[in-house]
Swiss-Prot record:
Entry protein name: Formamidopyrimidine-DNA glycosylase
Function (record text): Involved in base excision repair of DNA damaged by oxidation or by mutagenic agents. Acts as a DNA glycosylase that recognizes and removes damaged bases. Has a preference for oxidized purines, such as 7,8-dihydro-8-oxoguanine (8-oxoG). Has AP (apurinic/apyrimidinic) lyase activity and introduces nicks in the DNA strand. Cleaves the DNA backbone by beta-delta elimination to generate a single-strand break at the site of the removed base with both 3'- and 5'-phosphates.
Family: Belongs to the FPG family.
Reported cofactor(s): Zn(2+)
Native organism: Latilactobacillus sakei subsp. sakei (strain 23K)
Reaction it catalyzes: Hydrolysis of DNA containing ring-opened 7-methylguanine residues, releasing 2,6-diamino-4-hydroxy-5-(N-methyl)formamidopyrimidine; 2'-deoxyribonucleotide-(2'-deoxyribose 5'-phosphate)-2'-deoxyribonucleotide-DNA = a 3'-end 2'-deoxyribonucleotide-(2,3-dehydro-2,3-deoxyribose 5'-phosphate)-DNA + a 5'-end 5'-phospho-2'-deoxyribonucleoside-DNA + H(+)
Amino acid sequence: MPELPEVENVRRGLETLAVGKTVSAIDIRWSKIIVNPDEVFTAGLVGQQITAVDRRGKYLLIRFGEQLTVVSHLRMEGKYEVVAKEAPISKHTHVIFEFTDGQQMRYLDTRKFGRMQLIETGQENTVAGLKDLGPEPTPTTFLKADFYQRLQKHHKAIKPLLLDQKVVTGLGNIYVDETLWLSHIHPETPANDLTRAETDRLHDEIIAELELAINHGGTTVNTFLNATGHAGAFQEMLHVYGKKGVPCERCGTPIEKIKVAQRGTHFCPKCQIKRNAK
């Protein structure tokens, strides 16, 4: 599933390629992707101009004029491309936005799990999943004191808590494993067992790692491509994710993979020592 760095790179691509274009028609080829009735979605957007592309967590917010927004969640395999209408159409293309300039914005999804919902701008908190999102992982919105207080309320393992988008938004399996390794924290450590110093370091690593991943185009492990059709490069910088059996960069101990809250989890058993609950 694309995580925050990947979605941010899709956003940047669409901002460059699609903003300013006006919709002339919409071809919906797989209706389940559209939350609204097809006719409502189409009627609302034909004739509208894309004015901005924003992001909240892993959600894209495609702005049309001043009053309408398409909330788009890529889920597992969703991606966008902006191409000439003459370009061959992939069998995995499920929604096509035709523009008045002859180009098209296409939504592709091999798994068909992605979703789009047309709403009035300003009503984002009515969308399931958006209304309960935690802070964006930036120094001004993701505060150390608040993060520490949130973790102190939970005795569950730190990994699934970080995956909960209510604590901090945008993290998924890859970046949770990476930031826990950078912070020397075992993924099964009870959240309320972390000291303030450990929590502060984890906070800083989350912000720094996501920013670094964004600047390297995100991580392409399987099929991720940004809106310009390019893969990310951050997979070359991963420390533990997908590296079972590979020597740890810090200590040489083989990286292990376990299940934590039903999620495959990579860590170093020497650098990330498991602690018991208080």
